[in-house]
Amino acid sequence: PKMGRITEKGIHYINGIPLAESIFARDVLNPVEESDIRRLIAQQSAIPVSLNEKTEKGILLYDCRSDEEMDSPSKEIFRSNDTYKLIAGCAGLLEKIPLESTEKKKREVQLSDKLIVLSGSLNDVTIAQLAAAEKAGACCRHIPMEKVVRGAWSEEEMEEFIRSFSAKERRWLILDSLGSFKEEDIEVEDLSETISLTMGRLADQLREIEPDAAMMVIGGDTLQGVVKQLNIRTMEPEQELERGIVLSHYTNSHKEGYLISKSGAFGSEDLLIRIQRKIQGGF
C-alpha cells in the first residue's frame, strides 16, 4: 500500500488506476487485461476464491487499502498453525510477520561491494532505471537476443561473454534482455520463459566466476528462472533494502548465498543507483 498498490472489493489498483488500465496492461511479456483478482485467478485455476470471508477450502482474498488494514488478517494468517497452507503477498506483507515466529537469530549480512544486475524485464519503468544507472557509471550490456530466441547461445559463448568484461566493469555490471531480434524467430508466449531460463543460466555461470558479488534480479519471471537454474530450495527474506526491494538468503544442495529481487514495474529512475550505493557502503 505504501507504494500505491491496493485492493478494494477485489479490484486491484496501481496508484488509483485499475490494474488492467495501468502500466501492467502494456507489459510486452505479460500484459494484464483483468483488474478483478478473482477473475484473474479464475483464468488460470478452477480453485474457488472468496473475498474477505474465511472458508475451509480454496483461496481467501483480502482487500487491503492501507498498511493498517493488513494488521488484522496478517495476525490471523501468521499465528494460525495449519489453516493456511500457502501465503502469497507483496513485500509489504513481510513487515507484518510477527517476530516471535522467527526462531533463528538474524543473520549478519555480508556482501561484497560488487553488484551484478540481471534484468529480464521489458517494462518502461525498468528501461528508464537501467538508462539512469548506465549514465551513473554502470556497465550496461544487452545479452545477444538474436541468439537467445533461437536457442543458439551456447554455454561456451555465454562464459566468453561474461569474461569479456573487465574487473572494473564487473564491479557494477547490468545485463539485460533489451537487445533486438527477429520477431518471427520466436512466439510471443514463449519469449518470457526463454528470457528467464537464459538469465538463470547466466546467474549460474556468474556465481562460478564472481561468487562473492551481490546479485540483483529484476522481473518475477526472471527470478523464477534464476531460482530454477541455481536449484534454490529455500529463500528466506532478510530485509527490504528499499520499498519492494527484497534481500533474501537462499540455500541449495551445496551452497548458500543472497539474492536481491525487484519486480519490473515500479520504483524511481535512480533506484538502481541507490541500491548500488548501499552495496558500496555495506550493511
Task: For the regions a language model picked out, list residue spans one by one.
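Cap/lid and interdomain-hinge subdomains that line or gate substrate/regulatory clefts
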Residues: 1-73, 79, 282-283
